[in-house]
């Protein structure tokens, strides 16, 4: 039996939406992952304060991944609390599996601003979601580091989806429709608990 391959998708998931689930499923299939763990942030240091509480975001994730047996929630950052740094999360991963951190092209461009980014890149593989047919151009500092350490970026063809959590929050606050943007159980949960109003 080979090494277990695990994808890691960090985010605020405020709220989790269809593009998050589609990216996780695509990564699992394209990279041959045994599991994709969604890692909700406690307090992401480069983002605005979160709107929904950790228990609400965890419950929405549970609802979103129901029916996706290869997707799981890793609550390590919420359990740790405080400022959320990917480097701390990566250092806490148990040994054995091969890990792939899933990034968007926007995250790739600011990756070298992350705390201890070299340590992250040394410990896990980086997989970047790109438009099908497009190539990725990492920042020069990251490209040089990868070349010096004989590492590569894994490209993950993923058609962009016009979905963002901030747009969904604005729509919900305005009472506008979010049809097709949220998994149905998540939309029902948000309505029941009057979130993002």
From Swiss-Prot:
Native species: Bordetella pertussis (strain Tohama I / ATCC BAA-589 / NCTC 13251)
UniProt xrefs under PANTHER family: NICOTINATE-NUCLEOTIDE ADENYLYLTRANSFERASE-RELATED, PHOSPHOPANTETHEINE ADENYLYLTRANSFERASE
Keywords: ATP-binding, NAD, Nucleotide-binding, Nucleotidyltransferase, Pyridine nucleotide biosynthesis, Transferase
EC number, as in UniProt: 2.7.7.18
Name of the protein this chain belongs to: Probable nicotinate-nucleotide adenylyltransferase
NCBIfam families: cyt_tran_rel, nicotinate (nicotinamide) nucleotide adenylyltransferase
GO biological process: NAD biosynthetic process
S-S bridge residues: none
Pathway assigned to this chain's UniProt record: Cofactor biosynthesis; NAD(+) biosynthesis; deamido-NAD(+) from nicotinate D-ribonucleotide: step 1/1
One MF annotation (Gene Ontology) recorded for this entry: nicotinate-nucleotide adenylyltransferase activity
